[in-house]
Amino acid sequence: MAIAERRSRSHLALRVRDRVSAEVFFEERFEDGWESKWVKSDWKRDENMAGEWNFTSGKWNGDANDKGIQTSEDYRFYAISAAFPEFSNKGKTLVFQFSVKHEQKLDCGGGYMKLLSGDVDQKKFGGDTPYSIMFGPDICGYSTKKVHAILTKGETNHLIKKDVPCETDQLTHVYTFILRPDASYSILIDNVEKQSGSVYTDWDILPPKQIKDPEAKKPEDWEDKEYIPDPEDKKPEGYDDIPKEITDPEAKKPEDWDDEEDGEWTAPTIPNPDYKGEWKPKKIKNPNFKGKWKAPMIDNPDFKDDPDIYVFPKLKYVGIELWQVKSGTMFDNVLICDDPDYAKKLAEETWGKNKDAEKAAFDEAEKKKEEEEAKDDPTESDDEKPDEEGESDGEGDDESKDIDNEEDDEDVHDEL
């Protein structure tokens, strides 16, 4: 108890000291009493498909007192949210950060969070609830292993056009999304920038400033063929008289061939090595080649600049809404603020402080798992070993078993 109190006091000291320069809109470290701030949705509960959350530090960790919330049931939907005083990020930097750990070695499922605006019935929060920002890792099979960064404008969800690979191991990782007043952004994983750019270019929120002139047409005399037939090249005399096949000069009439019984003998034909097919003049560089024609660009009459493209004026909720085939994903240390430095310090104080101990705990858990699996493996005793005389037959049996096992594996793969 004394250790937990000292830990809370040290956290409080850091919060007070660093919050002087940062405006923190929401911060959740999932300590005792966290449930008073979070609302578990009834979404999918009537269908018995709503998953339950565990409050835990996980199977392996760097600090048993540092807990988060973890999905606990396979093949379930999860939805939970928390409210905070409504604010707009206009004229200020928006920082959205949280940590995720996929203890279950995730095959298919999300690890992302959402920011919502306006008034939301939190008990009905689910997959159809509109959101402003969706951010975080998503894994499914071999094809999807990326960080989502989706910005909603109007009723359209705009996906980031750049690839941002996510972490896929079973350890804790911190994901940070920074959106600035100049519409620039950064995506960090474990306090390391993985992607950056501009909202103007990396999301298709606005129509393009310029478009191809729809009225433009390629001039009739435009030469877009790089090579043309050589007008000086002439077909050789007698070219068309060259036969496709000729009589095989090596063929000889069989000695036992009887013209009366077998008919008149005819030598077989073979492809003519001198036959070159249909004659075509050789190609030369087109002296009038102008390149591939492109329609000229013109200003897009539908383009309208939006200096507030980065703005979300009524942010009010943070939520987790996802589907998981295999449960075990843990969320912790959720932060919404205006100061990237504060977010970085929070990440270092939590994830950074515990990552080495967590890795050691994970390695130890894996070692114990391997030892247990080794104990469970059947070993062949001496009295079960085949004698020398029957050794050949035994090898044949093993080979037959191997073939059967391979066929079983193929059947399982086909079923999947």
UniProtKB/Swiss-Prot annotation:
An alpha-D-glucoside binds at residues 112, 114, 131, 138, 321. Glycans are attached at residue 54. SUPFAM superfamilies: Concanavalin A-like lectins/glucanases, P-domain of calnexin/calreticulin. One of its GO terms (cellular component) is endoplasmic reticulum lumen. It comes from the Eukaryota. The keyword Transport does not apply. Residues 263-301 are annotated as: 3 X approximate repeats. Disulfide bonds join 108-140. The keyword Zinc applies. It is found in: Endoplasmic reticulum lumen. InterPro entries: Calret/calnex, Calret/calnex_CS, Calreticulin, Calreticulin/calnexin_P_dom_sf, ConA-like_dom_sf. GO terms for biological process: ERAD pathway; protein folding. Residues 379-416 have a biased composition (Acidic residues). Residues 209-281, 349-416 are annotated as: Disordered. GO terms for molecular function: calcium ion binding; carbohydrate binding; unfolded protein binding. Keywords: Calcium, Chaperone, Disulfide bond, Endoplasmic reticulum, Glycoprotein, Lectin, Metal-binding, Repeat, Signal, Zinc. A motif (Prevents secretion from ER) lies at residues 413-416. Residues 194-259 are annotated as: 4 X approximate repeats. Sequence repeats lie at residues 194-205, 213-224, 230-241, 248-259, 263-273, 277-287, 291-301. Residues 210-255, 349-378 have a biased composition (Basic and acidic residues). It holds the Pfam family Calreticulin. Can be divided into a N-terminal globular domain, a proline-rich P-domain forming an elongated arm-like structure and a C-terminal acidic domain. The P-domain binds one molecule of calcium with high affinity, whereas the acidic C-domain binds multiple calcium ions with low affinity. Belongs to the calreticulin family. Molecular calcium-binding chaperone promoting folding, oligomeric assembly and quality control in the ER via the calreticulin/calnexin cycle. This lectin may interact transiently with almost all of the monoglucosylated glycoproteins that are synthesized in the ER. This is Calreticulin. It comes from Berberis stolonifera (Barberry).
